[in-house]
Amino acid sequence: RFKKIRRLGALPGLTSKRPRSGSDLKNQLRSGKRSQYRIRLEEKQKLRFHYGLTELQLLKYVHIAGKAKGSTGQILLQLLEMRLDNILFRLGMASTIPGARQLVNHRHILVNGRIVDIPSYRCKPRDIITTKNKQRSKALIQNFIASSPHQEELPNHLTIDPFQYKGLVNQIIDSKWIGLKINELLVVEYYSRQT
């Protein structure tokens, strides 16, 4: 993880740690001139590691975004941001996306009153995300919400009621609220050159 954030910069979905300020400068000096391919590859890897996806999963999302109307890059980011594991992370119910994925896999999370154990579940507007009524589930979420550093930075497409352990998806995310500094066009370019 630390090698990844040193090489690619801050990845809030992967870990809360930040690279040291001088390490980015050292990387640029050590590596010399960066080719266009390397720049595109690094942006793709940044997206992959932040959301915790395999290469095949990311490729699938790129194909879905390519078939939809509109900007492929923007739609790709919207698809990734509306995943259940990412929504839990953005609500502050988990400290990282892998942590949110574990909560979902262990069946602690309900969407609209039904247990969902698929982290890639695509949330829609007006979805209500809650925890199971079990004490253990509530204790896990309570710890994350209490220690969540980004509670005040909640994006406008989400609302949370920390006392009832309930989150609400208001709308599809707007591109300015995406939690990762990334040039999504470079990711789309990377995949368009691969085929």
UniProtKB/Swiss-Prot annotation:
GO terms for molecular function: rRNA binding; structural constituent of ribosome. GO terms for cellular component: chloroplast; small ribosomal subunit. InterPro entries: Ribosomal_uS4, Ribosomal_uS4_bac-type, Ribosomal_uS4_CS, Ribosomal_uS4_N, S4_RNA-bd, S4_RNA-bd_sf. SUPFAM superfamilies: Alpha-L RNA-binding motif (SSF55174). GO terms for biological process: ribosomal small subunit biogenesis; translation. It is found in: Plastid, Chloroplast. Residues 82-143 form the S4 RNA-binding domain. Keywords: Chloroplast, Plastid, Ribonucleoprotein, Ribosomal protein, RNA-binding, rRNA-binding. It comes from the Eukaryota. One of the primary rRNA binding proteins, it binds directly to 16S rRNA where it nucleates assembly of the body of the 30S subunit. Belongs to the universal ribosomal protein uS4 family. HAMAP family: Ribosomal_uS4_B. Part of the 30S ribosomal subunit. Contacts protein S5. The interaction surface between S4 and S5 is involved in control of translational fidelity. This is Small ribosomal subunit protein uS4c. It comes from Watsonia angusta. The lineage of its organism: Eukaryota, Viridiplantae, Streptophyta, Embryophyta, Tracheophyta.
